[in-house]
Amino acid sequence: MRIKLELFGASRDFSKKNHLEIEVQDKASIKDLRHEIILYLNENFKGNENFIKIIKSSTFCSENNEIINDNYEITKDQKIGIIPPIGGG
């Protein structure tokens, strides 16, 4: 399945576009999607640890703008948003 991953906040550094297209297996979970994103980052950004930390600490939201957890099952091609943590110093 093809996921259009909408990028927000710090995750916008992952692409020149405002999204990534990620392939996942049928009935993948958000946990599986998170793993595929990390593989993408390892391949395209040489394992940038800051980017990987962003992925590990981000929340995801469905097409209906609902927060979804790592067990959420992806059953079709769809848009999913990634919402990195917001922090300051």
Question: Where on the chain are the PLM-derived regions?
Answer:
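Ubiquitin-like/PB1-type beta-grasp interaction modules and other compact soluble beta-rich domains
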Residues: 1-88
